[in-house]
Amino acid sequence: MAPERLRSRALSAFKLRGLMLRGEAVKYLTEALQSINEIELEDALEKIIDAVEKQPLSSNMIERSVVEAAVQECSQSVDETIDHIFNIIGAFDIPRFVYNSERKKFLPLLMTNHPAPNLFGTARDKAELFRERYTILHQRTHRHELFTPPVIGSHPDESGSKFQLKTIETLLGSTSKIGDVIVLGMITQLKEGKFFLEDPTGTIQLDLSKAQFHSGLYTESCFVLAEGWFEDQVFHVNAFGFPPTEPSSTTRAYYGNTNFFGGPSNTSVKTSAKLKQLEDENKDAMFVFISDVWLDQVEVLEKLHIMFSGYSPAPPTCFILCGNFSSAPYGKNQVQALKDSLKTLADIICGYPNIHQSSRFVFVPGPEDPGFGSILPRPPFAESITNEFRQRVPFSVFTTNPCRIQYCTQEIIVFREDLVNKMCRNCVRFPSSNLDIPNHFVKTVLSQGHLTPLPLYVCPVYWAYDYALRVYPVPDLLVIADKYDPFTLTNTECLCINPGSFPRSGFSFKVFYPSNKVVEDSKLQGF
């Protein structure tokens, strides 16, 4: 393409996004894009502008150095290496993005005035934790077709089916009765026995005597859409519902190729044609999920022997072993007992050379394993416990709880916590149908966009690292390893599984095939 035409196209593309290029920057960009054909030019410019906007910009006048950095980032993302195929991402390595309401986009932490996260959080971190949860759900709800403002000149019936979110401040400022209002807020119990709704603008007392609850587990500290009327400083609730969920593809349509998930890739792996091709071609790839691997129980070790001998001819890509790794979690000898148990497991694995050389082993600590108490995210086991095992089984990774796994273009979140029980115990009102608890549970987690929509005194979280527990954008596979009965569900284009407790459920586990997104229920009973 002629340099003048290329220059004109580049300037126009930047202008459309409210950016101006300095002369040197235009010259560099024209040279860099000279080899690209006209069909690919528009996509290339879009990617470069996205990379420019990720950088901390002091003004809309773009310097050459900024464009150079953006071009370099884009050229790296095109040249995917083997490192991008399989990655285990610890909770403390997940990138943090903060939603900017003015720019209507997520900004990386460096481009905000937020400090770097610290385990010993400040009061601001605690308040920010709930504000960010609210903001993410608010922007997601606002984009839903029921809450988008009607188009000017649209049919009256269409306008009538739209809803408008109100803030609590709006209600508190009114002296008269307000009917048919919908408010997005968090359920709290500020006084014993009295529930309130809270948002960044204020709190309001709730009257739940006539409230109807849609499907889900409505716990304290979860965010709800409350519909009802306001009178005498009390919000009388007719119905409670959860904020609408959103498929990952819809989220990415708004926020482009930003890598929210983490890992070495600068951009989201979802956009990579190379990785997608590798994923489709490798039909033998499989992930085995096992929870409550009690290594101190002879019967569990025998079943692992049977499992490894069965898989030895065609080793899985990865075994994900979740805690607890001991049936007797407490005691002065707990750490030494775990080291001995891991040594026994290493002996078993080394007895199957195919698995030892081909499969990866990922260890996710459980709530009663040795470590730093019950606060999430939970760090991996201490190196002093795992050193010997890692030397003998080099393809092993001891990671955090929760953790993330990226395989080609697929995103997997793994979380070991007895969450179903906690959420059922802390419900504002328990669902009438006990049989459908897994559906209620999965809907709640995905609607909240968070792994633990519970009060902090029930499920403590490091305030500054709360973002590591987000389930937004929705992953391809969500594994919540719980002692509750095993289940497999699909909701919002997301597969949600619970492998169940290995010893308690008759030695059941789950097998996931990424190439066709199929989950297989497996059991070792009767062997």
UniProtKB/Swiss-Prot annotation:
Keyword DNA-binding attributed: yes
Keyword annotations of the record: DNA replication, DNA-binding, Nucleus
Localisation: Nucleus
GO BP terms, alphabetized: DNA-templated DNA replication; error-prone translesion synthesis
Pfam families, sorted: DNA_pol_E_B (PF04042), Dpoe2NT (PF12213)
GO molecular-function terms, A-Z: DNA binding
Cellular component terms per the entry's GO annotation: epsilon DNA polymerase complex
Main location: nucleus
Keyword Translocase: no
Matching InterPro entries: DNA_pol_a/d/e_bsu, DNA_pol_e_bsu_N, POLE2
Further facts: In eukaryotes there are five DNA polymerases: alpha, beta, gamma, delta, and epsilon which are responsible for different reactions of DNA synthesis.
Known role: Accessory component of the DNA polymerase epsilon complex. Participates in DNA repair and in chromosomal DNA replication.
Family designation: Belongs to the DNA polymerase epsilon subunit B family.
Summary of subunit composition and partner proteins: Component of the DNA polymerase epsilon complex consisting of four subunits: the catalytic subunit POLE and the accessory subunits POLE2, POLE3 and POLE4.
Name of the protein in its database record: DNA polymerase epsilon subunit 2
Source lineage: Eukaryota, Metazoa, Chordata, Craniata, Vertebrata
Gene of this entry: POLE2
